[in-house]
Amino acid sequence: MIEIYTTPTCPFCHAAKDLLRAKSVLFEEIVVADPDKRAAMSARVDGRTSVPQIFINGTHVGGCDDLYMLEETGKLNALLAINTGD
């Protein structure tokens, strides 16, 4: 399961979602424009308030740059294996 915390106007959120869509994986988007949802996200990611925040199979992988780094180093497909059927 992939969870991505986003806001509607965040370009990094859009880039992260674009990469996940290109990988043909399903994800749950949690929009944190509401202060209560953002506080819940922040508590889950050790106080971070920036978006996106991405979880793959319950593991926090970081933000957009972290997701693209996983892709560049060839590690993203392995993390997504459960979701892609690889």
What residue spans do the PLM features occupy?
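Short, solvent-exposed coil/turn elements at secondary-structure transition points
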Residues: C10, A33-P35, I82
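Local sequence-structure signature of Cys/Sec-based thiol-disulfide redox active-site neighborhoods
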Residues: M1-L26
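Thiol-based oxidoreductase modules, predominantly thioredoxin-like and allied folds used
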Residues: V25-R38
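Bateman/CBS regulatory modules and CBS-like beta-alpha motifs in cytosolic regions of diverse proteins
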Residues: L26-E28, I82-G85
